[in-house]
Amino acid sequence: MMTINIEQLTEQYPLVKELIELKEVSWFNPSITRLEEGLSYVGLGSEDIQDASQRLKRFAPYLAKAFPETAKTNGIIESEVVPISEMQSVLEREYDTPIQGRLLLKKDSHLPISGSIKARGGIYEVLTHAEKLAIEAGLLTESDDYSKLLNEEFRDFFKRFSIAVGSTGNLGMSIGIMSAKLGFSVSVHMSADARAWKKNRLRALGVNVIEYAQDYGVAVAQGRKEAENDPTCFFIDDENSQTLFLGYSVAGERLKKQFDEKGIVVDAQHPLFVYLPCGVGGGPGGVAFGLKMAFGDNVHCIFAEPTHSPCMMLGVHTGLHDAISVQDIGIDNITAADGLAVGRASGFVGRAMERLLDGYLTISDERMYRLLGQLNEAENIQLEPSALAGMIGPIVVTKSVEYRARMQFDDTVMGNATHLVWATGGGMVPAEEMDSYLKNR
């Protein structure tokens, strides 16, 4: 474990001093590159996304029957894109800043099965593991109708195996729900910030929920340790998993199709800005990778983190990645945005994606709660606090004169822009919990 000299670090990177002071800051990386240059650092390509997409299609008949809420989309787990013009007006008034272009919301908050962005990666990794086990056992071939997985023989087979994961909440929900449905024995190691209702829902499904008084990093480490001691246990590693990453990446081609259907153009003169809440980085990193593969250099991804948990901005800005945590510089990693309460970023995602991400911003809990209330009033859309992290993004981009000048985003180009706020969770929040969120504004 390296020792961090804070004085030296803040001298070299003055932005770190502002992070330590819990200020809301933004940083637009001057070292970003074109997709063709940055892609080699990811180590994955379009064929990997296609492989993931095809796997999800194979499982669609099973999902449509196992989870009736997915029947109307024929077993495809996808969310809608909605305009939020009233919220756009609220933001413009609140910050006295006109947002050029249109503002849209991507409602991963209301994805079927688990009500968060983690329904993409988490469910995909469980399905990938189940497919591998069943094919190796001679119970399944890729040409089969996967709805046969509903048969009792498959549940009996999967009962012989277990799955473990460490989570702040939403990933555990997705993996717990999916694993339990297939028949796996599943343990979810939950960090201190995980919401009680998420733990209760998992326990009601027969999931083994193990609680920790410490943060996300400890929960992940304990989950990993449990799996190491059991050859039948598969550990889903949110910090390093390429499978999770690819599950999220399929979102890119699907969003492109949604935009095509809506007649939304994305090109050099019509840029797309996407604002993604970031915890450890797997979800936003995978989605950003998929978006880059779908829209190329015309999509500009910006990660949003709580002021108390700015692990990705800290890791990328200093170049230390997962060798530094927010706790190393005296930040407590305690935030109302429980899904983003991560002190140490994924080294895999940071290194893979740093050249392809335009920028990073931090936002206070107070501002997230205020935005949550404003969105509820303006659009009647209810989200959990972490899902609002990116809502300030269009204001930050509009006010970032240096970034816009460097990228040659003049007023004409910005007038043609699409701003997409990625809402990451909230669709399954119980009414009484949502009421308490709204009271906090």
From Swiss-Prot:
GO MF annotation terms: D-serine ammonia-lyase activity; hydro-lyase activity; pyridoxal phosphate binding
Cleavable signal peptide: none
UniProt protein name: Probable D-serine dehydratase
Cofactor(s) in the UniProt record: pyridoxal 5'-phosphate
Superkingdom assignment: Bacteria
UniProt family annotation: Belongs to the serine/threonine dehydratase family. DsdA subfamily.
UniProt entry keywords in alphabetical sequence: Lyase, Pyridoxal phosphate
GO BP term, example: D-serine catabolic process
Pfam families named in the record: PALP (PF00291)
Enzyme Commission number, as recorded: 4.3.1.18
HAMAP family, per the entry: D_Ser_dehydrat
InterPro entries assigned: D_Ser_am_lyase, Ser/Thr_Dehydratase, Ser/Thr_deHydtase_PyrdxlP-BS, TrpB-like_PALP, TrpB-like_PALP_sf
Modified residues (N6-(pyridoxal phosphate)lysine): 118
UniProt source species: Vibrio cholerae serotype O1 (strain ATCC 39541 / Classical Ogawa 395 / O395)
Encoding gene (name): dsdA
Catalytic activity: D-serine = pyruvate + NH4(+)
